[in-house]
Amino acid sequence: LGKSVGTIGVPVGGVGTSQIIDANITTAKIADSAVTSAKLASGLLPTNTPAFYATMSGNQNLSNNTATKLNFDTEVFDTDSKYDTSNFRFTPSTVGKYFVTFSMLLSSGASIGAVQVKLRKNGSDVLKTTQAHFYGNAQQSYMISGIINCASSSDYIEAFGEQDSGSTKPVIATVTSSFFQAYKLIGA
């Protein structure tokens, strides 16, 4: 004891990766500001995929009191090719919870009492709402959104509409009012 210990300066760049033992580096020793998504390895950050947004290429008729699957046959985007435009079905094949939205613009006139919009998983209703039609409106939008749990890689989701006017009514094809979309929730 009684001896002084001196320190020497290490030149900038004097310590390379070969001198650092991986076990000595912890995330607590790395400043938060030094960690950016650009510096992380590809695939390390979670994403909201698979995801899709589909619309209709033309109007579609809804028969009276008949649940009808909507023909969303045009993809605006489909990150993982999980939406099928031939059967109008989203099969994510990745287990998880999905935020799903379905909207339709119905050209109805004054004769509709109620309209239902439904989201079905594997052929059964999982989300459904019945909305009264506002008499006198020539067109009205109907929408449903919610979280659907896909617990199996074969689970699929479809969008259905129904109306009770006593006659056939058209769903109007518009990108902003008649659409079907979904994305996986991160961490769910």
Where are the regions that the model predicts?
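Extracellular beta-strand-rich recognition modules
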Residues: G96-L106, S141-S145, D155-E162
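Glycine-rich strand-loop-strand elements at beta-sheet edges
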Residues: K118-S152
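Short, low-complexity N-terminal tether/leader segments at secretion or assembly junctions of large
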Residues: L1-T36, S42, S177, Y183-I186
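Short beta-strand/loop motifs in extracellular/secreted proteins, especially
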Residues: G113-V117, D155
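A short pocket-lining beta-strand/turn micro-motif at the edge of beta-sheets
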Residues: S152-I157, S178
